[in-house]
Amino acid sequence: MLLSCRHGASSPKLDNLVPSGKMKILLVFLGLLCYSAAMPMQMPRMPGFSSKSEEMMRYGHFNFMNAPHMAHLGTLYGNGMQLPQFFPQYQMPMWPQPPPNKKHPQKPSASKQQSKTDPAPESQKPNQPQPKTPTPKQPLNEPSPTPTQPEEETQTPQAFPPFGNGLFPYQQPLWHVPHRIPPGYGRPPTSNEEGGNPYFGFFGYHGFGGRPPYYSEEMFEQDFEKPKEKDPPKTETPATEPSVNTTVPETNSTQPNAPNPRGNDTSPTGTSGQGPNPRSNPTGQNGPAVNVSGQGVPRSQSPWGPRQTIIHENYPNPNIRGFPARRQWRPPGPAMGHRRNGPFYRNQQIQRGPRWNSFTLEGKQAVRPGYPTYRRVYGSTARSNPPNYAGNSANLRRKPEGPNKNPMVTNVAPPGPKHGTVDQNENIQNPREKQVSQKERTVVPTRDPSGPWRNSQDYGINKSNYKLPQPEDNMLVPNFNSIDQRENSYYPRGESKRAPNSDGQTQTQIIPKGIVLEPRRIPYESETNQPELKHSAYQPVYTEGIPSPAKEHFPAGRNTWNQQEISPPFKEDPGRQEEHLPHLSHGSRVHVYYPDYNPYDPRENSPYLRSNTWYERDDSPNTMGQPENPHYPMNTPDPKETIPYNEEDPIDPTGDEHFPGQSRWDMEELSFKEDPTVRHYEGEQYTSNQPKEYLPYSLDNPSKPREDFLYGEFYPWNPEENFPSYNTAPTVSSPVESRGYYANNAVGQEESTMFPSWSSWDPRIQAQGQKEGRPYLNRNFWDQSTNLYKTPTSSPHQKENQPYSNNSPAGLQKNPTWHEGENLNYGMQITRLNSPERDHLAFPDLIPPDYPGGQKESHVFHLSQRGPCCAGGSMWPKNNPLALQDYTQSFGLAPGENPDTSIGYAEDSHIKYARQTVSPTSIVPGQRNSSEKILPGESQNPSPFKDDVSTLRRSTPCSVKSQLSQRGIMPLPEANSLQSKNTPCLTSDLGGDGNNVLEQIFEGNQLNERTVDLTPEQLVFGTPDKEPRPEGIPNEMQGNESERQQQRQSSILQLPCFGSKLANYHTSSIGTPSSLGRQDSFDGDPIMPTETPNSLAGLATGAQFQNINVDPLNEDEHTPFDSLQIGTNPQDQVQDCLLLQA
């Protein structure tokens, strides 16, 4: 327009030009010029940085540009708050560059973006058009931009004193972006948790077109609006501040509580001191001056200026009542729901970003562990984002004006006056939330009557908060209570699902809130993801119940996990799951909490749910059977479960799919804890994860495992500290088992922990599983699931269904899926196992790469280190032959070196434990090696030795046989316990199983037969039970061993890594099948991979193995050499891995 006007001044010229046709050119030029003047923000930016850069912006090429969005997404991706901070820093140089371009002075107001964009175009276009364009642009921009600029520049220091004009352009956009984007979105830059901002984040993310327009429009508007905001805020500062002051005195009443220190400090310190808070605190910066700041709040206040006035008019009561209470309620949310509530409520309020930022800081503080911060970021994404975005956006959208404005302003205006308080509360929220938490928590119970509010206001609370200033108070309380209750009742989500209160009130609020609630509900149900970030952060707090801030501690939450996971809370949780709505807060939220820890600790989720589910299943084998069938037949539900879980796995990071997934969880668990569906989620997690999603879940969820690691470290080890190894194995290892077995066994049994799913050794499951009250769960799980699940794989196993162990060996790691594909899956999974990814895939159950550190399982599964391909030994960092193998494979260690130790250990209970623990790994390498080496023999010699050894292997999944036998775990109790552990490990013994699987793959029946023969007793009791570990069976095995060796020679390559090691382990004998298998390979050198190991094991180990293999008397030696040879076989396994991988 300016150009047109300016050129319009020379209309005669233009008229003269018109005839010559130059008018067209001029008009085109002017049009292009005007377009470039307007567009350079976008276009020059893209050209200036290149459209690729614009595309790359998502990757941070324009880190600063995407900073606002990348802040959220960055947080989602782990960039977190830092990106906005870094980006501003990065912007600092960037913006200084534009100022040198002459246009920055002009365009700071016109558009910093323009200044940046135009300078880029100028730099790019400096050739010819730019001289002209700059000239018109400068005049164009100068007329209005310059006037605007002074304000902006003047405002800029005010707005972002810390950042200065250089950063301010982006800080402004950041601020404006957050506030401009619906306040409900919270500040995306700061909303790294919100960074979730699915809407905003994605808006900015895929909104490159949207984002530059966002910048163009928003920055452009902001440039003008900011002056407007500034002017009104300046005007409002007196006007609003009086109101704010009216509120602020109240706020100050609140602020003096805890925030007062940061009330004013927050503005300088909070702004400059607090990374995210600068964005949020700039609002809180000037307490009253926040209006002047016009940054976070002024930005918001610009729109809120009138609103704030109104809100302050309306708000004094809300501020006086609702605001202090609300703030207090906020702190209770943070206090009670700490981060969760903080995120929810805070995000609700902080949707404008100040509180959110406070929450970010506070969340970081409260979620000190760091992964809670990640959780926050992540969980907030799912959880806070839905509330903030869906809920707040919905609130803003639904009630953009009346309550939304008031509450928004209440949120924002209070953040203005009370921003120091709120930010302070939130900044101080850790202190304040604890301070206010107690009293406010007390109030929250007072507000508990608004539990319906809380429930419905969980997500609707934003709306409720935004609906009514005073109910805002209650809503805040419910907001926190809702958060708390969300945490506690685990959500009005549950209640939203109940939909009486939540949906009743919330549905009004639910319209967006329904969306929000469902996503949030689902997030809460799926709060596996969100709480995964937060569940440890604060859902755990809420897991046990919002009632006590102590529950803030996720240690409490973890204890809750441990207790609930392991203790009746699970059993109690069936009721709770039925309760799930309120206690889905516990159950579902613990559910979520488990999901938090266990989105793919679904077994943890499942243990929670599944504990409920499994306990219920325990209550009703049909439920168990069915869920277990779906669980196991996860292959059956697997598509659904796999897809949902995959969705959840991928979306899981966003927590959105977790919303659905967890909604499934909670709803399904709620609905009937029909863990088939829950298992769809859990099963998705585990079912899908078993063969595939298990890896995805283990590996796919590594993000979540990282959350989960946050939880996995946090929860899996902690909640499952009972059996971290198992936990890890369950976590990753047993999608179903984690669900049912690992979850239940993991929760209920530490013995079964390791191999609860392997604990399909139903004797142990019955022993331990029964002690868990889920023996049949394991049994059903294995029996039925194995039947159903393994039925395809093992009709023989079905015949073996009698021994759940049998099936469990068959489906050792839920290997119903694997074993179902025992022929295929196992071979394939062995291949998976052979490949590092596949390692996790095949043994994700047993070897959760995610929880490599499942302290116990760290050895067992962590050997996802498992080495190159079947890194079976890696899992045995503790003197495990397999660990050696893994390491040996990785490092090519002299197999005999550590294996010797491992050998001793293999025979010792440590190695046995390690091997048991490592068994999954052992299975992987063992099965690889055993499969490739022993498998041929087994395939050819399936009936006597295979059935015995293979069954043993299968029954004693990995080294369990060797280890149990060597270890003398033959005792049923220990055999059950260790074998259970070993059994899953013997999924490593699936070396045997792997061989069996391979054999079944090759032979079909023999694995099942073997498993049928040995699994129930030999597995749990007898196979390793035979105290002459390998001697009893090993004699037979050894007898068969020669055959097997010879036979193995033919089939060596099939499961080189997977079966070879453990198969040798098992081949050596039940106790030392690995020795047998390896010795077979070593002895006859029939197996290709064995040759290299023969070279290695050709050392004493190879020869001894050969001798030992042949001699039943040498079985004990076999065990050491088995371990050693496992250690020695690492190269073998490496080769095997290569073979399998090839």
Swiss-Prot record:
It comes from the Eukaryota. Residues 90-347, 374-513, 543-587, 603-662, 787-820, 921-965, 1020-1049 are annotated as: Disordered. The modification Phosphoserine is found at S53, S191, S216. The keyword Signal applies. It is found in: Secreted, Extracellular space, Extracellular matrix. Residues 243-303, 381-395, 453-467, 787-816, 952-965 have a biased composition (Polar residues). One of its GO terms (biological process) is positive regulation of enamel mineralization. Keywords: Biomineralization, Extracellular matrix, Glycoprotein, Hydroxylation, Phosphoprotein, Secreted, Signal. Glycans are attached at N245, N252, N264, N291, N462, N929, N1040. InterPro entries: Enamelin. Expressed by secretory-phase ameloblasts. Intact enamelin and large-molecular-weight enamelins are limited to the most superficial layer of the developing enamel matrix, while low-molecular-weight enamelins are observed in deeper enamelin. Preferential localization among the crystallites in rod and interrod enamel. Residues 277-514, 666-669 form a propeptide. The modification Hydroxyproline is found at P547. Residues 223-234, 431-442, 570-582 have a biased composition (Basic and acidic residues). Its main location: secreted. GO terms for molecular function: structural constituent of tooth enamel. GO terms for cellular component: extracellular matrix; extracellular region. Involved in the mineralization and structural organization of enamel. Involved in the extension of enamel during the secretory stage of dental enamel formation. This is Enamelin.
